[in-house]
Amino acid sequence: MTADKLCAVGAVNKAAVGALDVITGAALFAPTGGESAVAAAAGELTGVAAPMGSGTGEVCSIFPRPESSGPAAEIRIVWRLSSTPPKEDTARKFTRLPMSEKAGAAHDSAFVTFPCSPKDKPLASPDRVSVWAQSWALPTEAEGDVRPLKNAYATLAHSFALAMAKQLDCDNNAGLKPKPSLIPAS
């Protein structure tokens, strides 16, 4: 399966296809969660939001085809929900990026956190949704220039965050722009 059809048609945009190539070195992938993975994750998130205000779940897992020999064995796209804004302390391994409410990238993962208020309730207190793209290979130390990997993980997290914001019908797509902002925040 080609990268643009992973997890849900439209969830992996053109930039994220290139990011997957940087991360995995693969052009073909094992079939994943189907055509409605993002819609299913948004439905699960919506079900959690009302009663509890926090939770976690998986959007999908991405597996390079067995004949691929890339550095990452599996990439998981997960969501986390919180009713409070993110804390300002970001783990040292993450480079802060200016996307939506909070974002960060490392050589093996990235996240984008965005507020989501339904369009039909603009005065409602927004929930915070974090979308993570993470390598599930054994942890390794970063070597050499890790900027391409950081940018790739950030691009992948942004692609899925934007797809989730659209699926959740967040006001103004939760402030997420069509392209990721990869210049570190100051």
Which residues make up each language-model segment?
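A small/polar (G/S/T-enriched), proline-flanked helix-loop surface module common
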Residues: 1-156, 162, 173-185
